[in-house]
Amino acid sequence: ASMNYFRFVEFHDQYGIIPVQNGRNLTLGTTVVPSHAPDDGSAAPDCITDGSDMASSPYFKSNHYPYSLTIELPQPSRISEINLATRLVNGSETAYKYTIEGSMDGQEYQTLIDGRNSWIVGFHILPVEDRSAYKFLRLNVFQIINVHNNHPATWADGIYEFTAFGFPL
């Protein structure tokens, strides 16, 4: 199954309904730097920006919690939306507790999305209200929780895709 979502669509007489992205895909093919090494069986961190978010796609899994994944954008950009696709294991319902931050210099970060109280499972559609420009984005994963019993579920960890949409400056 694919995990694409489009907030807007347009109708074209010849082609029918056309999905409209919330800006340019700013993260496609970018390098990802993890705070900790991948776990055994994990794909390389760059898999989260390869454009592939299918259940059969490679995913990043850390060997340490909490962990961070930092992405350097090709140029400073205004971020309009972030899509985060997380792994689901045989119907397990796990919620990620996370933040997403932005920075111009890679040193001082501003929180763009606070998902530490999130109970969303699987695919996250995250509008970004902050209109500042950012060169770096960082996903901080604090916990992965089984939503049925509130127990840690790091065994189900896996980030398929992190896609930031927006407008380069």
Language model segments and positions:
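Aromatic, loop-rich ligand-recognition surfaces of beta-strand-rich domains
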Residues: 1-21, 52-111, 120-169
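Predominantly extracellular/luminal regions of secreted and cell-surface proteins
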Residues: 14-50
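Short beta-strand segments within Ig-like beta-sandwich modules, predominantly Fibronectin type-III
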Residues: 115-117
